[in-house]
């Protein structure tokens, strides 16, 4: 009898009889699925392209990257003149540092720093007590510390030198990558300079400047993460019992080491804290949060490892079967490479647009010919739309990878003639994806996106609350909401993978595929749940190992450059990159396991093991399933060793 199924506000007509009679074999003739969602994604990306274009035109990322003076010139670049500002439009190619004429007495006035800022070729590393010393420094180093309109020969002769030159004595300073500023080195001047420059800077600028200040370290850690993920991928390809024990040992050591280092760094910060700097307090609070989270994760993982330690041998056999299935289309192992390349390209583009959004503003000439940049309020608040674009597009790219892997493995699994494997299964799967099922990938990625966004909003709201406002009730509410959304996200992730696999087999839309897959797995859940958990847990430990070593490298690298850096944000960026890259690489095995189990359930549903309807499954896979279920039955109910299907027919080896 036909019925209706509701999915994301739309009703789909589902025939029960048609569902029962579905052949569950890879379809040759297909139709486009979830086309409205593909149109929606296209319209969303039209908005993203508009933001990209407008931010590039209106923004000036160079001001953030290289720093700028008080007259509208970006240091280290050749500038265009600003109308009404006579000292603008100068060639600052050789003048790469920002120097404040009164660095020891900075004030914030109307979103701008009061003292005049100049572009100089080098910072004075020794204290200059007189104008003669300032003039000598200019003649020797070619670095002019007075306003551009005053010639260096007139430093000691002009009556206006007191207002056009820095206040004496000029403190020694050194260049620092944060905004390319000359940072005073005397303790008194440094604390005053830092408290104004950092604490009163725009929050978005502080985050972006922290990322740019540590860009080389971030890039190096990303390369390290990429190499470690690749090594872990090939380690799982040639898995063994010894290797599993090594991975588990490294994970335990890594968790304990990272946890200990985080608590040690937090203790170090609490005993060596500059109360003038809010960024130091932010770093300390982030360090405490990192330490608590790592401790909880360490305890939970150690408990799980201890509980599942006796299933290691079966897990190795299961991964051997998975490797055998992957070997039928070995290029699946290289699938994460192009996925990772596309993700990196998109993230670089996203960060470039974010930099432009953060610096979008119009030049306004003030009294005395100085130039101030007034932010464009409308464009600057578009970063929320930009953030949604980051999450949705990243999830879409990963969804395309999962559907490609599903299509290739399905074609290899449902192949009777083992001597004649499918030709180019990956290319065929890609062709089917881009011609018919992009809308399904968009819909699945949208589900994950709308689940992630509330988590981001909750974290932002909670982080804005001051400590007195964080009552026990609000903390408990936040943790429950965060935990609930995390569980929902994990459920949707597995639902999406099953839906993609069903779509790859039957060519149906997302909701129909999800329903069919859920129904057929539910009938065989007793056979599959425990086995699937073991394999996924070991793969998860591989991801944890990559993330642990990446975070440890980040802790060691960023801790050596604390001064004036919001380095908790770059560390979070490295951790996020490590999670995504490790997941992108090792998800090939995780995806392959999920696909194998769904295909196994389909096999049980549509075949009975007889000579007329033999199973497609590999005998090794059948053996692992039977041994695992026998172990479970012996521990719980002592049931018989044979693994029955729904009708009670004993599974038979595949007929060759």
Swiss-Prot record:
Chain segments carrying region Disordered: 634-656
A GO term for molecular function: organic cation transmembrane transporter activity
Keyword Cell membrane attached: no
InterPro entries: Choline_transptr-like (IPR007603)
Subcellular location: Membrane
Top-level taxon of the source organism: Eukaryota
PANTHER family associated with the record: CHOLINE TRANSPORTER-LIKE (SLC FAMILY 44), CHOLINE TRANSPORTER-LIKE PROTEIN 3
Official protein name in the record: Choline transporter-like protein 3
Species of provenance: Mus musculus
């Amino acid at each position: 009898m036909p019925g209706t199924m509701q999915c994301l506000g739309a009703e789909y007509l589902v025939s029960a009889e048609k569902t029962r009679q579905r052949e569950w074999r890879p379809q040759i003739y297909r139709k486009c699925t979830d086309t409205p969602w593909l149109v929606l994604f296209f319209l969303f990306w039209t908005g993203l392209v508009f933001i990209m274009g407008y931010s590039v035109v209106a923004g000036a990322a160079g001001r953030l990257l290289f720093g700028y003076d008080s007259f509208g010139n970006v240091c280290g670049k050749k500038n265009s003149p600003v109308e009404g500002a006579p000292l603008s439009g100068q060639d600052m190619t050789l003048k790469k540092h920002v120097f404040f004429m009164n660095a020891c007495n900075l004030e914030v006035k109307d979103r701008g720093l009061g003292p005049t800022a100049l572009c100089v070729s080098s910072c004075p590393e020794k204290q200059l007590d007189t104008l003669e010393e300032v003039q000598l420094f200019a003649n020797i180093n070619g670095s002019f510390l007075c306003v551009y309109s005053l010639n260096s020969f007139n430093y000691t002769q002009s009556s206006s030198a007191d207002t056009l030159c820095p206040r004496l004595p000029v403190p020694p300073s050194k260049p620092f990558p944060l905004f390319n500023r000359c940072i005073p080195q005397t303790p008194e001047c440094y604390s005053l300079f830092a408290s104004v420059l950092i604490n009163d800077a725009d929050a978005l600028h502080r985050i972006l400047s922290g990322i740019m200040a540590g860009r080389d370290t971030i890039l190096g850690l990303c390369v390290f993460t990429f190499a470690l993920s690749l090594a872990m991928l090939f380690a799982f390809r040639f898995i063994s019992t010894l290797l599993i024990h090594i991975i588990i040992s490294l994970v335990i050591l890594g968790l304990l080491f990272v946890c200990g280092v985080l608590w040690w760094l937090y203790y170090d910060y609490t005993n060596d804290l500059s109360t003038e700097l809010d960024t130091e307090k932010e770093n300390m609070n982030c360090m405490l949060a990192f330490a608590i989270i790592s401790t909880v994760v360490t305890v939970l993982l150690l408990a799980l490892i201890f509980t599942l330690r006796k299933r290691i041998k079966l897990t190795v056999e299961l991964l051997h079967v998975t490797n055998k299935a992957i070997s039928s289309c070995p290029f699946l192992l290289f699938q994460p490479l192009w996925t990772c390349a596309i993700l990196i390209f998109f993230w670089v583009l996203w960060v470039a647009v974010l930099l432009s959004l953060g610096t979008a503003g119009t030049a306004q000439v003030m009294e005395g010919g100085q130039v101030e940049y007034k932010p464009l309020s409308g464009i600057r608040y578009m970063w929320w739309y930009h953030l949604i674009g980051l999450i949705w597009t990243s999830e879409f790219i990963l969804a395309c990878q999962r559907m490609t892997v599903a299509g290739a493995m399905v074609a290899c699994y449902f192949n009777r003639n083992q001597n004649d494997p499918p030709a180019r299964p990956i290319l065929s799967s890609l062709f089917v994806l881009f011609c018919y099922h992009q809308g399904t990938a968009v819909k699945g990625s949208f589900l994950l996106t709308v689940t992630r966004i509330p988590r981001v909003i909750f974290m932002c709201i909670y982080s804005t609350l001051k400590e007195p406002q964080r009552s026990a009730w609000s903390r408990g509410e936040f943790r429950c909401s965060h935990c609930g959304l995390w569980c929902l996200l994990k459920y949707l992730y597995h639902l999406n993978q099953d839906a993609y696999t069903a779509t790859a087999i039957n060519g149906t839309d997302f909701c129909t595929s999800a329903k069919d897959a859920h129904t057929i797995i539910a009938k065989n859940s007793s056979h599959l749940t425990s086995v699937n958990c073991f394999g996924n847990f070991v793969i998860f430990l591989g991801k944890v190992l990559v993330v642990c070593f990446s975070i440890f490298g980040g802790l060691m690298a960023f801790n050596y450059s604390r001064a004036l850096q919001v380095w908790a944000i770059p560390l979070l960026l490295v951790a996020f990159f490590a999670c995504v890259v490790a997941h992108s690489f090792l998800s090939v095995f995780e995806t392959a396991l999920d696909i194998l189990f769904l295909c196994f359930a389909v096999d049980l549903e549509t075949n009975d093991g007889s000579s007329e309807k033999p199973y497609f499954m590999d005998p090794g896979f059948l053996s692992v399933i039977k041994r695992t279920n026998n172990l479970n039955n012996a521990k719980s109910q002592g049931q018989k060793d044979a693994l029955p299907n729904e009708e009670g027919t004993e599974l038979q080896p595949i007929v060759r």
